[in-house]
């Protein structure tokens, strides 16, 4: 079994569509092994997205991710990372396939409702950023 990290972003939490996204998570065969709703500080968002610190969108991204609560999750199933990326859809909702989370719920390239690890290495960094081993069941 493989694990991946996922975030339901502020735009989705603000629109009260957490349940609709969780339905897609479960329909895709994921087991939720950790989940919590948190409010990131700007500093925590900057630490999480440090890999993008030189990119022009970094400050806007960190402000967006800390503007209101998010739901952070650890998802488990075979081929979890690639499957979650397929369920999310393309980063830009306009380019996402029908039935994906971003096509169904995303508003823009930034407000695209969800985040997911893009590799085993990023999952290995992202999961312990938010969860201790004791929190993963």
Swiss-Prot record:
Gene Ontology MF: a single term: nucleoside diphosphate kinase activity
Statement: the UniProt record of this protein carries the keyword Transcription regulation: no
Binding sites annotated in the UniProt record for ATP: 9, 57, 85, 91, 102, 112
GO biological process: CTP biosynthetic process; GTP biosynthetic process; purine nucleotide metabolic process; pyrimidine nucleotide metabolic process; UTP biosynthetic process
Localisation: Cytoplasm
Phosphoprotein in keyword set: yes
Highest taxon above the source species: Bacteria
Alphabetical keyword list: ATP-binding, Cytoplasm, Kinase, Magnesium, Metal-binding, Nucleotide metabolism, Nucleotide-binding, Phosphoprotein, Transferase
EC assignment: 2.7.4.6
Chief location bin: cytoplasm
Cofactor: Mg(2+)
A GO CC term assigned to this protein in UniProt: cytoplasm
Transmembrane segments: none
Xref: HAMAP family: NDP_kinase (MF_00451)
Oligomer status and interactors: Homotetramer.
Functional summary from the UniProt entry: Major role in the synthesis of nucleoside triphosphates other than ATP. The ATP gamma phosphate is transferred to the NDP beta phosphate via a ping-pong mechanism, using a phosphorylated active-site intermediate.
Record-given protein name: Nucleoside diphosphate kinase
Organism: Geobacter sulfurreducens (strain ATCC 51573 / DSM 12127 / PCA)
